[in-house]
């Protein structure tokens, strides 16, 4: 299966289990991999035969900057479900949601979750 990557997207959202996260908000990063057949796009040089990266970006933006949720797992599920539902050629997608600055003590680069979902 071929892959389209949209990586390093950054958004500001109000997600988390702590009141401070819901009030102050924080940065979130998203990496998205969509799996689909890209052979027709490569042969025809036609955008209609692939998926538009900008549309994938806006799906992620709308969800992360939208309704607050408690868990990054919920954000990832919503992104994956929307991508699989909205883009017919996509057969599988992987979504990684990264919290660069979670409100927990310690030294670390970030915390993240990653899910992979397929069309049924």
From Swiss-Prot:
Alphabetical list of Gene3D superfamilies matching this protein: 3.30.1130.10
Residues that coordinate or bind substrate: 21, 53, 72-73
Gene Ontology, cellular component aspect: cytoplasm
GO molecular function, one term: dihydroneopterin aldolase activity
Reaction equation(s) it catalyzes: 7,8-dihydroneopterin = 6-hydroxymethyl-7,8-dihydropterin + glycolaldehyde
Keywords associated with the record: Folate biosynthesis, Lyase
GO biological process: folic acid biosynthetic process; tetrahydrofolate biosynthetic process
Pfam families linked to this entry: FolB
Known pathway: Cofactor biosynthesis; tetrahydrofolate biosynthesis; 2-amino-4-hydroxy-6-hydroxymethyl-7,8-dihydropteridine diphosphate from 7,8-dihydroneopterin triphosphate: step 3/4
Role according to the record: Catalyzes the conversion of 7,8-dihydroneopterin to 6-hydroxymethyl-7,8-dihydropterin.
Protein name: Dihydroneopterin aldolase
Species of origin: Bacillus subtilis (strain 168)
């Amino acid at each position: 299966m071929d892959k389209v990557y949209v990586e390093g997207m950054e958004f500001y959202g109000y997600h988390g289990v702590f009141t401070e996260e819901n009030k102050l908000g924080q940065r979130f990063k998203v990496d998205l991999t969509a799996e689909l057949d890209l052979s027709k796009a490569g042969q025809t040089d036609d955008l209609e035969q692939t998926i538009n990266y900008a549309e994938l970006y806006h799906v992620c933006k709308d969800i992360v900057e939208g309704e607050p949720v408690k868990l990054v797992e919920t954000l990832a599920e919503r992104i994956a479900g929307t991508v699989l539902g909205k883009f017919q050629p996509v057969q599988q997608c992987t979504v990684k949601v990264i919290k660069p600055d979670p409100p927990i003590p310690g030294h670390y680069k970030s915390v993240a979750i990653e899910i992979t979902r397929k069309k049924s």
